Amino acid sequence: MTTEFLQISEKNIHILEKFITINTSENFTYYKKRNKEAINNHIVTVILHKEEEIIGYGHLDYEEKVWLGICVLQKYTRQGYGKKIMDFLLKEAKNKKIKQIYLSFYKNNVIAYQLYKKVGFESICKKNDVCYMVKNL
């Protein structure tokens, strides 16, 4: 079984809703602070899936800067899916001529930090429990 990316829009937003419902990670709080209609302001929003099984989520959005967000469901972590989502989003950013991408994560999320360093993000600051990183494309 191969994995595929599905671009999320208003037409298939129910798939994003399913992801939000089944994701139990305390490290992914994006939709706790926003409603699902936030995708209307995204540059790209994708779900990585294998047949009917959702594996993870990723997006690029613009809030004064371009921000990248990803989340892999717990049972799929450390299997290369985070890197696959990251590579897809970075390619999308390059295709759209984006020059710089930011991300944030909770400092206790060591798995995320390792992935972000691996793909070339650099730490820029920490505020309380949140770390910020940037990558020039």
What is each of the regions a protein language model found here?
Residues Q7-K75, E92:
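Acetyl-CoA-dependent GNAT
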Residues W67-C71, Y102-S104, V134:
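Short aromatic/hydrophobic contact patches that present stacked aromatics
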Residues K65-W67, Q100, N128-V130:
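A generic structural signal for beta-strand entry/edge sites
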Residues D61, G69, S104, I124-K127:
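Solvent-exposed beta-strand sheet faces enriched in polar/charged residues
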